[in-house]
């Protein structure tokens, strides 16, 4: 029997030393699943609410005992006897129990941990892998692909304590024949970059997502360092490796002055000027993807950006869309961006996450599955990427176990699926 008999919540630690929520879901047949909710640093204002205790005497107010309490009491009671194979029903029970638009009563962290743990328990009950169960839930049974990784090898912005304003500088191993080879190429470039930075007298300390966090003179200097590292590793930029940016522009947007302020290099831009600044970078370097190139509320600016670059460059909405179908639909209807970043804790349940993926794909948008800067050893996003054939994944650099755990899971999945899960490289990127 795949009915839920026990739900357990607990407070565990994330990769930044902050508490987060973990849940176990047990079924009548002995099957069970465990999942943990991640946590972001640069968060969109429209994200579902991450419930924190606010008790300054404990974990600086970041405890999650309230959310854990909801799991162990209200949620556990409501889900007792529910069929774990009916994911949408399980999730809807929790959404109804919460009763708010942004999950502010129970917390998206509580609901998500239970939602994902339920999916894992159901997969075990069916005696299938998690990615296989996710493909079934997605309405695409047996359809898989290995994602093109977007590897964040230089961290800036809110993910690092340095002078670089753009948050992520990523490499994409488009020349690889399979995921295993892509991972190797990324690792070799990561180590090559360490040597380049050291030779120039820069720190090789890493940021939240495992990439280096040097103090560089400009954002362009980060791209220049990566260019040298790629060549030194024996690869050709533009042929073997392409580049991607996550600007996280909301973090350096001055709302009062209505300007984009790159403090690290002392430059200020209007919305239109910043679009041209980004376009100029794409003409100097093989940048094929730009995420959150403007503030999340700058819809006019995004419309201009999409007209300017949308036919050639993948323009990814993260803070812009926050994995929310209502907001995504507005973007689709108004010609804003052409790709969505998927972070399931932005919306708070697996069912709603799958709905966002479907809406994006149906509209011709590409999909990038993503981690958060505060992560755990939970590798569910690897299975999500393969099980939905999303095509792309962002899960950090080639260091820190919380990042590498996802890559290692993808290696295992590729070993299991072989030719059933093709690695399509650059074909997955919008505009390429």
From Swiss-Prot:
Which residues are the signal sequence here?
Answer: none
Q: What is its EC number?
A: 4.2.1.11
Which reaction(s) does the protein catalyse, per the Swiss-Prot or TrEMBL entry?
(2R)-2-phosphoglycerate = phosphoenolpyruvate + H2O
One MF term in GO for this entry? magnesium ion binding
Q: Which residues form the active site?
A: 209 (proton donor), 343 (proton acceptor)
- GO terms for biological process, alphabetical: glycolytic process
Q: Which GO terms describe its cellular component?
A: cell surface; extracellular region; phosphopyruvate hydratase complex
Q: Which family does it belong to?
A: Belongs to the enolase family.
Q: What is this protein called?
A: Enolase
Q: Which organism is it from?
A: Pseudoalteromonas translucida (strain TAC 125)
Lineage in the entry? Bacteria, Pseudomonadati, Pseudomonadota, Gammaproteobacteria, Alteromonadales
Which gene name belongs to this protein?
eno
